């Protein structure tokens, strides 16, 4: 195709390359535990999920798994891609939840929330991490509602 006829807005290569270049241009890092949500534009997470799905299908093929005839693995690539982007690494691709604080009305003791279930992944081996967390704070000038602890823990995990 004549280069002059190409649409200038169509990105070259996979969406992951476009996002990666955007982050590199900003001078920020994108390590496994970093939140990169500010660099993902509307509609790109869906494209990234499709890309991961294609690569997951290739991985299953390389593992010599018959995803066409084995009913257990039909559509597994789609399910795994969705799980990795929306759940396991969800805090990487979504902004931190909004946390509203309120004036402390003189409460001086520690208050806690837990157990809060944690499902995460080790950034070194991609091994599942499953457990519970308890969060406790001694309030100062401001306090937050107990439900916010769950949101923060789930985002960070």
Model-derived features with residue positions:
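Active-site loop/lid in soluble adenylation, ligation, and acyl-transfer enzymes
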Residues: 2-132
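Histidine-centered catalytic/metal-coordination loop motif
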Residues: 66, 121-157
């Amino acid at each position: 195709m004549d280069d002059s006829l190409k649409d200038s807005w169509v990105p070259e290569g996979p969406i992951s390359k476009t996002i990666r270049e955007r982050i590199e241009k900003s001078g920020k890092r994108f390590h496994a535990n970093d939140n990169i949500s500010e660099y993902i534009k509307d509609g790109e997470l869906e494209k990234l999920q499709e890309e991961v799905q294609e690569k997951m299908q290739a991985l299953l093929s390389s593992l010599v798994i018959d995803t066409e005839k084995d009913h257990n693995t039909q559509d597994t690539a789609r399910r795994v891609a969705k799980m990795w982007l929306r759940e396991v690494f969800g805090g990487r691709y979504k902004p931190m939840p909004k946390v509203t604080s309120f004036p402390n009305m003189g409460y001086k003791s520690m208050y806690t929330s837990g157990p809060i279930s944690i499902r995460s992944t080790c950034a070194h081996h991609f091994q599942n991490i499953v457990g519970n967390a308890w969060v406790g704070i001694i309030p100062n000038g401001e306090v937050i509602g107990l439900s916010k602890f769950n949101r923060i823990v789930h985002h960070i995990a």
